[in-house]
Every structure is written in C-alpha cells, then in structure tokens.
C-alpha cells in the first residue's frame, strides 16, 4: 500500500498490527516494512483477473513485479487496519437513555450507532483523517459496545501471484481438505 505507515497501538511488536482486512472479506498479513501484504490466491483472484488479458494471462502464467514500477494498481481493492478497539459501552448506554426511539431498537441500528460513533470520536478528540473509518458494533445482544477505529488504504498494487495451476492446485476438494495449494498472492499497500 502506498503511504503505509507502521501502526503502534498496543506496543511496537504487537502481532495483531500485522493482520489486515483484505478486500471484501479476506485477511492478509503485512510481511515487510514497505507494506507488502501476503494473502490467499483466491482473495487476490479478482485483482489478478483485472489485469489479465490475452497478451498477459496472469491467471494462467502468474505475475511477478521485479521492481515497484512494474506493480499493477488494483482498482477498488482496499486493505484495512484495525488501529484500536475501544469499549464504549458506558458512552453508548448514556446516549441510548437520551434516545427518543419509540420502538427502543436503535441499540442495534447501524445508522444510529454510526452517529453515536461520530459523537464519541468528537468528544474524545479521536484524530480522523480521510482514511479513518469508525465502526461501532453491539456485542452480546447489545450488552457491550465496541468502537473499531480503522485505517483504510486504497492504493493497492499487485506485486505477485503464482499461476492458477499452483494457486488452485488440487481444486476445492483437495485444497479445502488437505491444503496442497500455494494459495497465495502478494500486494503492496
């Protein structure tokens, strides 16, 4: 990811700082100080497909950028870091007491919780940048509330991917049961 900066929230060596949310539902790991992300081949498949053509069949033949100039930008792909997780239960309960919802179900409403998250961030002077995302989630049926403070990177570039013959070796039957595959793809955030 271009513009990647190492995150330090629970200590500089905290392993959870290396794990990212990759795209729409995968995970990845930061494996270098320059933001190199390792994820599964099937997670990077859309990015590989996006850059494949008749002349450059990266799905069949794989792809490896030999330098940063050869890295390929991946439109629409994001990598998200969770910078902090805050227990905001007391604050949310105070806000709910002031709520005039006649049905009393706002405690689970994502739209309502988003406004509460914004108010909390302002009240606590949480630094918000264009890359910051706040997500307030109810847990245990609304008995606990946690605010996830995230940084989203959207300048993601394809660095490497093995050929599908390696990345999907054994197809789903073997891969899901025995994991014989080299199910990996490299991106830079």
For each feature predicted by the language model, list its residue ranges.
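N-terminal leader/propeptide and maturation segments of large enzyme subunits in energy/redox metabolism
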Residues: 1, 65-139
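Start-of-domain marker
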Residues: 1-13
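A conserved glycine-rich beta-strand in the N-terminal activation segment of trypsin-fold
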Residues: 17-34
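Short, flexible loop/turn elements at secondary-structure junctions
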Residues: 24, 43, 160-162
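Structural recognition of the beta-strand scaffold that forms the well-ordered cores
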Residues: 30, 37-39, 157-159
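Catalytic-histidine neighborhood of serine endopeptidases
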Residues: 38-82
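Gly/Pro-rich turn-and-neighbor structural signature
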Residues: 113-178
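Conserved small/polar residues in nucleotide/adenosyl-binding loops
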Residues: 180-187
């Amino acid at each position: 990811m271009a513009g990647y900066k190492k995150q330090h929230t629970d200590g500089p060596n905290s392993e959870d700082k290396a794990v990212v949310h990759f795209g729409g539902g995968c995970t990845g790991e930061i494996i270098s100080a320059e933001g190199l992300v390792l994820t599964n081949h099937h997670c990077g498949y859309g990015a590989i497909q996006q850059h494949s053509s008749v002349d450059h069949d990266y799905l069949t033949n794989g792809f490896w950028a030999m330098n940063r100039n050869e890295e390929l930008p991946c439109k629409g792909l994001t990598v998200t870091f969770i910078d902090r997780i805050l227990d905001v239960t007391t604050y949310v309960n105070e806000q709910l007491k002031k709520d005039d919802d006649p049905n009393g179900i706002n405690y689970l409403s994502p739209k309502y919780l988003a406004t509460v998250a914004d108010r909390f961030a302002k009240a606590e002077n949480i630094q918000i940048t264009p890359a910051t995302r706040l997500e307030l989630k109810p847990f245990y049926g609304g008995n606990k509330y946690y605010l996830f403070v995230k940084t989203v990177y959207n300048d993601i570039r394809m660095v490497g991917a093995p050929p599908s013959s390696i990345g999907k070796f054994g197809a789903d039957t073997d891969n899901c049961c025995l994991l014989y595959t080299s199910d990996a793809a490299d991106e830079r955030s």
